Amino acid sequence: MAEEFITHSAEETTAWGRELAARLKPPVLVLLSGDLGSGKTTLTKGIVSGLGAAREEDVTSPTFTLLHTYREDEPVFHGDLYRIENFHDFETLGMEDLFSKPGIVILEWSERFPLPLPWPSVRVRLEHLGGDSRRITVI
């Protein structure tokens, strides 16, 4: 059953991410989808900080680097699949290695994920409602 939340600011979206973090148990994939500017990275700031893996201000979009690692001992990865076109791209970037050790993998643009899901997953859809408001749907 889907859960739906409305946030009215970036701070509320980040806070909701911290709440979600408390429910995550590795290994798990957090699959984020939503249009450009819908709040995927803002939500990730809350998740990563809620896990104690990094401070909010240290969490940035991996659009150009494609992957950020926030913790190695209990891995927390944040990837961006926007530029991934096919399995070959995914494989060439070594992204399959994310699943070599149980951890938490947060993927933006998850609709581009080219593999069967190797771990349990939480799907989160973000929608921009105008201004700073977002609809967050968790499946």
Model-derived features: positions:
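Short hydrophobic/aromatic beta-strand immediately N-terminal to the Walker A/P-loop
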Residues: 29-31
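N-terminal pre-Walker A segment at the start of P-loop NTPase domains
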Residues: 1-16
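Phosphate-binding P-loop
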Residues: 21-27
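Short beta-strand-centered segment that lines the nucleotide-binding/catalytic pocket of NTP-utilizing
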Residues: 54-68
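Short phosphate-coordinating micro-motif centered on Lys-Gly-acidic
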Residues: 3-4, 85-139
